[in-house]
Amino acid sequence: MTGFLRVFLALSATLSGSWVTLTATAGLSSVAEHEDALLRHLFQGYQKCVRPVLNSSDIIKVYFGLKISQLVDVDEKNQLMTTNVWLKQEWTDQKLRWNPEDYGGINSIKVPSESLWLPDIVLFENADGRFEGSLMTKAIVKSSGTVSWTPPASYKSSCTMDVTFFPFDKQNCSMKFGSWTYDGTMVDLILINENVDRKDFFDNGEWEILNAKGMKGNRREGFYSYPFVTYSFVLRRLPLFYTLFLIIPCLGLSFLTVLVFYLPSDEGEKLSLSTSVLVSLTVFLLVIEEIIPSSSKVIPLIGEYLLFIMIFVTLSIIVTVFVINVHHRSSSTYHPMAPWVKRLFLEKLPRWLCMKDPRDRFSFPDGTESKGTVRGKFPGKKKQTPTSDGERVLVAFLEKASESIRYISRHVKKEHFISQVVQDWKFVAQVLDRIFLWLFLTASVLGSVLIFIPALKMWIHRFH
């Protein structure tokens, strides 16, 4: 008896499962049949090239919105903005309405967009020839005739770049959408939301979106009005990369130029250092030229700074040549030092510049050299005439010795004078180096501050 019950229960379970499966299959088959019948009903005689209105005077209201998923690139050189967006579009198609009760309670269906009438909304400022979104997506059609279509699109839109404050710049790029063929009496655009949807936005490493809003407008041509929607994107560059790899090296090069005047003038590396800095700045200028657009309207901030430093370095080379020339002057090169130069560069300026003259200067009073003979070296004694040959020989010998001493003294004084002139000119060169060191350091700091502070203040103000 127990075995019979087990067989009976197993058979009952099998029959119940089969019945459920058959019921579900029948249900699915019924839904598919209803949807198939609905599609045949809706698209029988449907012309996608004809506006789906009851009266020719009716206006199709297209509710339009934009959702941005990625800011791919901002190309300053070619003045392009590349974005990945979704175009939200919704309108009512009077030819696609049905009673859900007649088709198994179906309230909405998915229809390929290429089978429907579309309001042909395109991007006007397109730069790569692709004006429309992707047609490979399906639209949702509701029983009330409402059509919702959200195709993805990748756009390259034209954008006029203002690189005045590069790399602390802000750009305002716009995307203008409108119907390509229908005027305002046939299709009207209505904004779903004035703010661009950024819920699924993927951040860009170089730019951030400060603001993105839409605004409706109308363009009139004769008797016709063409509605459009313009989305404005306010973009701010993140300047960390350019600050670390462009601005800071340029600042370092400018201060290297200042250190040229700290090198001794008798070293041959002063001109080599200045020339190397000038070549490095030229390379940086070529790098910037590859980034920014070629325009004669504005000079970018970093370009102004590089131009300032290049002029700065060029002047330092000219000044260095002059200082080296002063350093190697002497009386033998027919450059006697004027009295005012001595007073200014050897007495006054060193005190103002906190410089000390390390040389010990010796002065020889005029007229200290005796022009008399040996006989004149004995004051208070009466001049006597040698009485013997021995005395006459001794006096002649002493006079020759005195003449030799005077000759040696004159030669030593001349050598000392020449050496003193050489040392004086070298000290003048040191004073000039110290003057230009402070002048160029002050000019470098003030120039950097005056060029970058306004841009930094503007960038920080926009950040807050």
Curated annotation (Swiss-Prot):
Q: Which residues are glycosylated?
A: N55, N172
Single GO MF descriptor:
heterocyclic compound binding
The record ties this protein, via Pfam families, to: Neur_chan_LBD (PF02931), Neur_chan_memb (PF02932)
Q: Which cysteines are joined by disulfide bonds?
A: C159-C173
Instruction: Report the locations given in the UniProt record.
Output: Synaptic cell membrane; Cell membrane
Q: Which reaction does it catalyse?
A: Ca(2+)(in) = Ca(2+)(out); K(+)(in) = K(+)(out); Na(+)(in) = Na(+)(out)
> Record keywords: Cytoplasm included?
no
- Its job: Component of neuronal acetylcholine receptors (nAChRs) that function as pentameric, ligand-gated cation channels with high calcium permeability among other activities. nAChRs are excitatory neurotrasnmitter receptors formed by a collection of nAChR subunits known to mediate synaptic transmission in the nervous system and the neuromuscular junction. Each nAchR subunit confers differential attributes to channel properties, including activation, deactivation and desensitization kinetics, pH sensitivity, cation permeability, and binding to allosteric modulators.
State the name under which the record lists this protein: Neuronal acetylcholine receptor subunit beta-3
